[in-house]
Amino acid sequence: MAGHSKWANIKHKKAAADAKRGKIWTRLIKEIQVAARLGGGDVNSNPRLRLAVDKAADANMPKDNVKRAIDRGVGGADGANYEEIRYEGYGISGAAIIVDTLTDNRTRTVAEVRHAFSKFGGNMGTDGSVAFMFDHVGQFLFAPGTSEDALMEAALEAGANDVNTNDDGSIEVLCDWQAFSAVKDALEAGGFKAELAEVTMKPQNEVEFTGDDAAKMQKLLDALENLDDVQDVYTNAVIVEE
């Protein structure tokens, strides 16, 4: 993407994630519980659980923690009955934001999400107000220096839909979200380990923010990310570091 480094953004994202690993573990445990409750405890027949368990491994979560979360989900233990709710809204300058939550109290959650939006210059939207601006996809990002031709051949053979080389030399591979695990397995079997691999809501168009606007937008995103019930925050805003 012209004007900013996707690779730098990913490294920043990973560093921020490492800094709040405990919070990430809490979110992953909730996701594992819900995935196991809805689709069973076998990762081979439950794609959502497989994805959550893979994320837990990437976050260095102990296997015992993962197993306990699966058991709680399958057994319907207290704490496993979370409700999935998506909120949509706008940041400054109309930037689109999607907030995915898992909650046991929707009244509390909607109040906290609305408060974060209003406190930091955004506002809540209605269902569907911004979701159409995003595509639900599997996304992989490979480091600059990765062989573009070899990766493209492996990715397309694995079932990926698109391979893009960014201005900073990193390479992005996109696939249908349902095919994520199969594509990931095929790429890794071919020797290609992504620095970032996730199912995400990818914006169709991005809006760059710099200076004071970037700082304001980052505060809003951080406020939403830090809410206990929030699992994921997606936006078409790109924070450009100057």
Curated annotation (Swiss-Prot):
Gene3D superfamilies: 1.10.10.200, 3.30.70.980
One GO biological process term: regulation of DNA-templated transcription
GO terms assigned for molecular function: DNA binding
GO cellular component, one term: cytosol
InterPro entries: Integrase-like_N (IPR017856), TACO1_YebC-like_2nd/3rd_dom (IPR048300), TACO1_YebC_N (IPR049083), Transcrip_reg_TACO1-like (IPR002876), Transcrip_reg_TACO1-like_dom3 (IPR026564), YebC-like (IPR029072)
Subcellular location: Cytoplasm
Pfam families assigned to the protein according to its UniProt record, in alphabetical order: TACO1_YebC_N, Transcrip_reg
Keyword Signal: no
Alphabetical UniProt keywords: Cytoplasm, DNA-binding, Transcription, Transcription regulation
Signal peptide: none
Protein name, as recorded: Probable transcriptional regulatory protein Bcep18194_A5621
Originating organism: Burkholderia lata (strain ATCC 17760 / DSM 23089 / LMG 22485 / NCIMB 9086 / R18194 / 383)
